Amino acid sequence: MFEQSISTLAQKLRNKDISSVELTRLFLARIAKLDPQLNSFITVSEQHALEQAAAADVLLQSGKGTSLTGIPVAHKDLFCTEGTLTTCGSKMLHNFVPPYESTVTSRIQQAGAVMLGKTNMDEFAMGSSNENSFYGAVKNPWNLDMVPGGSSGGSAAAIAAGLAVAATGTDTGGSIRQPASFCGITGLKPTYGRVSRFGMIAYASSLDQGGPMAKSAEDCAHLMQAMAGFDEKDSTSADKPADDYLANLNSPLTGLKIGLPKEYFGEGLDSKVADVIMAAVKEFEKLGATVKEISLPNLQLSIPSYYVIAPSEASSNLSRFDGVRFGHRCDDPKDLLDMYTRSRAEGFGTEVQKRIMVGTYALSEGYYDAYYLKAQKIRRLIKEDFVKALEEVDVIMGPVAPTTAFGLGSKTSDPVAMYLEDIYTLSVNLAGIPAMSVPAGFADGMPVGLQVMGNYFAEAKLLNIAHQYQQHTDWHLQTPTMAKGA
């Protein structure tokens, strides 16, 4: 049951082959059995989930509901959920229960989905390995000694292990795509502004974007149907009608023009990962696509640009956590300054403190022009590279990450090695375009994701491309051994 698609489960719920309460209990039992090994959930909301499932059953009984009604999903723990702990993976918010619901979780709830709980993540979404969480590292279900990727590692691991049918994630520099690649699932980072950021705790406001994570492109499309669309509560929301993401999944790919950026296949890319990606591209050629080499000349500049812009925005966003209104407050402060200083020192982990310091430095007088302004100019060049390339081709393909999942603790002492894991994903966020990670095979027994990048608001096209690939391959149907034992 845990391996079945949203469409199949929705049909079973409609036919009364199973009730939402039974389905929810099945997933809660799997979480109880398997998650102690994975640590993919921070909060499991058992009672709330069963209440939602019972309400979904009543709705289905009357012949109403959507394709998500009664389907058990999980949410990354930076989406505010009214009445349910929302920690952002940080000690700073270890006791924060939001008084309101984020737009993303609200829309999925209105579609009738059941919330199993909140998934683990790198603290304030800062990390590429899910080792920066106050609640402990998440393990990769394919190999418990490996990282699941970050920062949405809990969501990716939970789906791969069959602890949730689908989940929400967020992507600031690859945080949906990289864990999706490492855990062998499908993930979509939408165009900036396509999915509301209201109630999504901010890391870097000009880069953050919520998106769906699931086993397949079709399941991601079901989630996008609920998530996408204009939201007046979010000033960065795109006032443009959302597409029907399910309507064109079966469109043929004949004549599709694929660009392969030479910069994505150079030094640093593991040769076994490259082989998997090229085999996937050949599959697209069989489906009627044509392939040409393109260039994104400023790719190498995406890391220095991103690691100035994102920490700068984070230092501003995270200044609100000072021990006054909400979040962690130190014991017995001597005065106001002592309370600010100690609350932040105690509440934030090392990586978050590091990025706040970098951002504050980059924005400080005398350095703003040298760092922040220059990084924004580079960002413009990167965006222009994509715009130019997407005039020649329909989509751009390449690897999501230079390697498969790496060992827990293997890169924590080398921040540059950790940051280089994001080399192929950061530029997409800087440009604001949509991109997906699609399971494409294995290297040394670990999953490899194919990255598919498209033009602004072309999510429906990306989902169509990924779905057609998944109709002719079965990489997305592979299940880790540990998941089969429950």
Curated annotation (Swiss-Prot):
One of its GO terms (cellular component) is glutamyl-tRNA(Gln) amidotransferase complex. Keywords: ATP-binding, Ligase, Nucleotide-binding, Protein biosynthesis. GO terms for molecular function: ATP binding; glutaminyl-tRNA synthase (glutamine-hydrolyzing) activity. The keyword Protein biosynthesis applies. Its EC number is 6.3.5.7. It comes from the Bacteria. Pfam families: Amidase. It catalyses: L-glutamyl-tRNA(Gln) + L-glutamine + ATP + H2O = L-glutaminyl-tRNA(Gln) + L-glutamate + ADP + phosphate + H(+). Signal peptide: none annotated. Heterotrimer of A, B and C subunits. NCBIfam families: gatA. PANTHER family: GLUTAMYL-TRNA(GLN) AMIDOTRANSFERASE SUBUNIT A, TRANSAMIDASE. This is Glutamyl-tRNA(Gln) amidotransferase subunit A. It comes from Marinomonas sp. (strain MWYL1). The lineage of its organism: Bacteria, Pseudomonadati, Pseudomonadota, Gammaproteobacteria, Oceanospirillales.
